Structures are given as C-alpha cells and as structure tokens.
Amino acid sequence: MAFLEEQVDIVVVGAGHAGVEAALVSARRGHKTLLFTLSPDSISMMACNPNIGGSSKGHLVRELDALGGMMGKVCDQSFLQSRMLNQSKGPAVHSLRAQADKQVYSQNMRHLVENQENLHIRQGEIVSLLCNEEKTEIRGVVSSTGARYYAKAVLICTGVYLNARCIYGEVSEETGPNGLRRATKLSQALLDLGFRLQRFKTGTPARVDRRSLDFSKMEVQKGDVPVVPFSFSTDPATVQIPQEDCYLTYTCEEGHEIIRENIDRSPMYNGVIQGTGPRYCPSIEDKVMKFPEKNRHQIFVEPEGRYTNEMYLSGLSSSLPEDVQMRILRTMAGFEKAEMVRTGYAIEYDCLNSLELENTLETKKISGLYFAGQMNGSSGYEEAAVQGFMAGINAVQKIEGKEPFVLDRSEAYIGVLIDDLVTKENKEPYRMMTSRAEYRLLLRQDNADLRLREKGYALGMVSQEEIKATREKQEAIQKELRRMENTYIGANEENNRILESIPSSPIQSGISLRELCKRPECNYQNIAPLDPERPFLSPFIQEEVEIEIKYEGYIKRQIQQVEAFKKMERKKLPKDICYHDIHNLRLEARQKLDLIRPENMGMASRISGVSPADLSVLLIYLEKEKERRKEEK
C-alpha cells in the first residue's frame, strides 16, 4: 500500500501557543517547517481564560517579545482591556495583563502563520515517531493516514489533547477542550519509546450570556489609561482605544451550601478524576471545602470578545454537575437570572515528565526530539509560548550545527521556568510566579528589552529597526542618569518652597538631582520644577531612570548574588560522571543526580533530594578528578 512521503526540515506537532511560536521561529530562520494541527480553526485557540499576562506571566510575554516572539505583538492587536497589576507594590512585581478578544487573537495569529514564508499548515493527527534503529535519533513522524514526514527535528506541542477527557458531574466525554477532537495514539507511541508520562488535570468555568446579567449589582473594573502595550515594538499611540469593562462579584454562603450538599457528585471528590490539578488555580468546590472559614470568594466577570455575549467567570472553575453549576451561579449578586452558555468542566490529559528533558527542551533519550508547552507539565498560554520559542530556536540551532541557546535563572523568567521544569519533579501543573525568581528585581517586565533584545538580534529574531530602538533607549537612560548625577540644585528659598509642596524636607546645602530622587517621597515627575533643563524623555525611559536611582542599593546587591550564582553554574559536571561510584553521596542524591544528569553544580544544587552535604561531596570529587587528570597528562 502506498503512502504519502514528504521531506521537511522541522515538524511541529500541535498549533497552540507553543506550537505557533516554535513553527514561526523555524520558518523565519529559513527552514521548511510543517505545522500539524487537529484543526486549523483552532490555531492559537484560547481554550480557557481570555487573559494574556498577569502576575509573572506578563514578564514572560515581554521577555518573549524582546527575543522576537509574537504573542505580545498579536495581543496588542487583539486586546479588549489592559491593566498593569500590582502597581501599589515595588517594580519587581508589576505585571501587565490584557483581556484578549479570543476569536480575534486566534485569527490574527493564524493570519501570521498562514503568511509566513517556509511555513505550511497540515491538518492531521500524528500517531507515532520515526527514529533510527537504535531509537536515539529522530527521523520524522507518521500521521493517522499512514503518511510519513521525514525531518531533521520534531517538536511535540500537543497541549492538553493527548488522551484528553472532559468531565463534569456524572458526564465524561472523550474529547479535547470545548468538545474538540482529542489525540489518542501518540501517548502510547511515546511510552513505547521509554518516555515517562503523567496524568494532569485542569479546569474551566461556565460561560454566561451577558444579556442575562445585572451589572449594576457588580463592581466595575476599568482598564488603565493610558494603555501600556505588551510589545516593545508597538507604537503606544496605536493601543489607546476604547476598552471593554470587566466586573467583580462574589460567591455567597447560599452558593457554598449548595456546593457542600452536592460535593459527593463532584468528580474531583468521588474519585472519577485521576489527574493532578493546578495548586494555584483551584476549582470553586476546592476553595469552599478547603477554606470553610471564608464566606465569599471573588469572581471576575470578563468579556470573551467584542462581538460575542459570552462572559468568562474567573474564579469559578468547576466540574460539578450542570444543574449544580446553574444553581450556584444564580446565588451571586447580578446573576439572579443568569443563563449559562457553556458548562464548566475539568479536563484530564497525558503529559511528559519534564525530567526527561535537557534545558534546551530536547529529550535526553532521542536527539532532535523536543517538547514544549503544557505537554511538559506546565500551565498557561504564556508558559507554553515561551517554551515553544525556546524549543524552536534550539531545534534550529542544532540542525544548523550552532551552539544551543539557554537562558539561566539570573537572565530571565524564561530561564527560571525551564530550569524548574528540568530539575524539579513537578507533581502538578507548573505555574510561573514572581516568587520563583530569585533575582526578580533584575528581571522586571519593564527592562525585558534591555536584558534580552541583543540576544534576540543575535539569533536573527529581532529586526535592525528594533535593535536600534533598544540601543537608543539604553543610551538615553545612561545619559539621563549621568546628567542627574552631575546636576545640582542650590539650597535657596524658591527650591525649598518647591520641596515643601511635594512635601519633602528642605535642603541645607546643594544636592544632586540623583540624590534628591532617592528620597522616598520624591520621584522623577514631582521634582521636575527643580529641573527646568531636563530633556524630553518617553515615560518608559523615565521609569527606568527612576528605578535605577531608587533601587540602586538593592540592584547592586542582587548583581553580587548573581555573580555567586554564575560561579556555581560555571562548575560543569562531566557528562559521563557515574554518581553511583561516588560513595559518600547519599543514596537519594545518587538516584536523583543520575536521573536528572545536571549540567553543572548550580543545577545540581536545585534538585530536590540533593543536600548541601551532597554538594560538598561533589565539589571534592570534582577537585580530585581535576588533579587526577593533571597527573595523567
């Protein structure tokens, strides 16, 4: 029987947020790329919430944009509302979040993919992988029709579709999200190749018809004015558009009682659901049962699009039966006559144990095979997108015979995310958080371009125009910092009157603008009357200048911490090291080190089960090996 055969450079399996970033990277670097999807209509589909960004996730989107990824640019073309979160806190945790129009976002990303040279979309299900005889090198993929697609690298970005099952109450449907077709055979193919899979779960809330809601009983949540774009390349003037409102309501004790009365019908509590769910995105039934002292929980009511009446209920994820969900809805203020458009559900799916991966997202078992996105046990559109970009760029680097591209924990949230995935055994869907980043004052969302644009340019992902703008921004910041250092104001009556109006204490002698700006009550804006000669600078440059001045001491301290971190990262561990021969290591440490095979002492130090004493043993072993090699020479 004859089957279709085709030769390409790179195959990407799955066209969600990870898959499209990976495929775009490959094609933009000039490689013939085939992007497989179960349905071209679901390219970059936002299957759950209508948000992009948020706490720490906004950092990921901006880092992706700085490297040359597309999520930020497309979000700027598709948003309904934008807010900078955590503005009452320090700049390290400021995070941009946008409500996106789900349909428009997906359409805009599909338009990009369809018009990208070297990139071809193919509808179909991939059921197995082609490898060399030893099962150590990838050769391509096989589709459900028997067609063979040969490639130099293969990227698996299948999201939550592998053996997916959607569950609510007594109903269990063998489908992907929103009733879409699932993938049924690739899991077994991966198991046959020796990969370890695990079963995770996530959930989504009901959607309601906005016409059935009484918004006068809810708190209005407005967007920020002016809007800050996600992409450093977007002209801020183009995103100053009318924004859609979101709303805040609350659950109540009556609704909580309905949940408690029906908890035996919850598939999470009666044993029907086997997968592990995300700790930081609990269902409403989980919140009610685990926090009985709380008599209400916040529910954010968010539009799914400009031209649909569907509203998303953030905070009300549930897999309770349909009738119970409807009863709970109608106990909330403004929801007395609510009509449900879609029922909330939980979805179980297969994913890879991410300890199978190198920090390039290439598998340890099979050269040229990469995994990215929720398939790696992470959660969220943003976590998926950055993994897709990193897997894509590393696949390209490999087939071109170039060095891998890896970001460490001191360089980017992306580095923290991937390092956590490949060194820690994640027993639940991994969510990025600012608290996971040790050097978060250096890894702010506002300076992602200053940190990473040069790297993106070196990779061929950032244009000449974009790098020029970043270099000019960097130069303007440094120039203004020097000017403020060298500009003094005198201790006279007029200047002290201005200081009093801030209010700030008077000065007794001359002081530099930089020193003055360090005062807690002073900022770049309110000292402007004391600085009539200051140049015109964009708000983004002003922000960088102020942060550099106000947090100078903390920034210097973190830079010193990074230097100590880099020292450990530079201590490489031999690839052929046999941990079972290092007898002073504890058994657990030997087993974990042998399983994960860390590249350096820094990675080894972050492995659960490897103690400081084990690290000391490793350091002594490395020194002895160094001396032994010297003697052999």
Regions found by a protein language model. Give the residues of each.
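An anion/pyrophosphate-binding glycine-rich loop and adjacent beta-alpha core
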Residues: S39-D41, M84, Q188-M326, G334, ...
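A glycine-rich dinucleotide-binding beta-alpha-beta segment and adjacent secondary-structure elements
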Residues: Y312-S378, V406-D419, S538-K592, R597
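Conserved beta-strand-loop-beta-strand element in the redox core of flavoprotein oxidoreductases
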Residues: L130-A147
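Conserved N-terminal/central alpha/beta ligand/cofactor-binding core
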Residues: Q7, L24-S128, T145, C157-E174, ...
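Extended, charge-enriched "interface" segments that sit outside catalytic cores
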Residues: R436, R453-D614, I620-R628, E632-K633
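Short hydrophobic core segments
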Residues: V13, R148-G159
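Internal hydrophobic alpha-helix adjacent to the cofactor/substrate pocket in enzyme cavities
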Residues: A384-F405
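Beta1/beta-strand and adjacent pyrophosphate-binding region of the FAD-binding site
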Residues: L4-A18
